[in-house]
Amino acid sequence: MNTKNLLLWASLALAMPMTAQTPQEDFKRDITLSGSNYVAYRGPQKQLTPAPKGYKPFYLSHYGRHGSRFMIGNKAYDVPYFSLLKAKQEGKLTAKGEETLAKVKMIREEAKGRDGELTPLGALQHQGITKRMMERFPEIFAGNTNIEARSTLVIRCILSMENGLQQMLRMNPKLHIFHDASEHDMYYMNQGDRHLDSLKNCVGIKVVQQEFAQKHINCTRLMKELFNDPAWVKQNINQSDLNRKLYEMASSIQGTELRGKVSLYDLFTAEELYQNWLNANIWWQMAYGNSPYTGNVQPFSQRNLLRDIIQKADSCIALQHPGATLRYGHDTMVTPLTCLLNLNGYGEEIKDPEKVASQWFDYKITPMATNLQFVFYRNKANDVLVKVLLCEDEATLPIKSDVAPYYHWADFKAYCLEKLKGYKK
């Protein structure tokens, strides 16, 4: 697909609203939103609130996920392909199964040698994000100001960063850009935590998730759609695994050059897609949100990232024209940081697994290229305000403010530091 067509697709995606009362209504309007963390980035859905009189933007701090990518690991493509191929060789495929095998083969071949790599659409997403940054906050990026950009060591993140920076330079060649990807910075850019990981991967949480999946996912109809011998299926196919991988494959197509050319959504009913999404959605909430099943502490995995945001902001506030600090990483950082800050209420505890879907929407938190932007404003008296954008839309915080969605920097900083005191490990 050429650049002109990519730009057209991206503009259409930006025009799609993402506000509806329920996930089912969202999915009915746009089936690709059922794709959990594979959802292709939509961009801002709302107009920005004008700044209070006398305040102008002067600094931006950011953390963003890489853009749309191919799926990770050979099994993501091989399990559906070889399961269907074996059935074909043994005469166990239906006509629909034959059709699906041909589609899966095409999808697998497109991804060959591109394990987890950034797609062309993923690159375009980051060009669009930085373009809008500069258009929305021109004062921050004017003249020969400084841009400090860092990425994790993963190539899709590095390429996301480079695409964003190239767009910036096209719009302002005077920018002074520092960019890096080093293990030196991974303690906050991509922090590991054995204690939190142990809670996330314990037997108890897996049992809860398995019980939830057994209650909500039924693969019987799908298996009959693909295979002509139920007894053979029981002996040869891991039905739940095949269902999950076909759902993920169907979801991932929207971020590749096969979008609009091939689809696997016809394999699922609307209810089956919703149930698959429920299962993915609850996994994200329990793994990275404020869940009693994982100790109510998973958001603290981003404690070092939040400290870095605060410390660099304090340093930049002292400068006349500080520019921007950009960070490029993963959904596994943006999501818990969103919860740690309790943006839009996503940091609230959810005790009942059955209520997660009414309070937590992974496709609004964790799409490809999801990002948090902290935009700083000040007036002539040097009073500093900050507002937070989630996926480029203004987010709310549980902080009292006379100018919301703008918050006084002193209040925001105190709120964050108090949060960080709550974690003792």
Each predicted region: which residue ranges?
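Signature for phosphate-centric chemistry
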Residues: 21-148, 152-325, 329-425
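Bacterial Sec-dependent N-terminal signal peptides
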Residues: 1-23
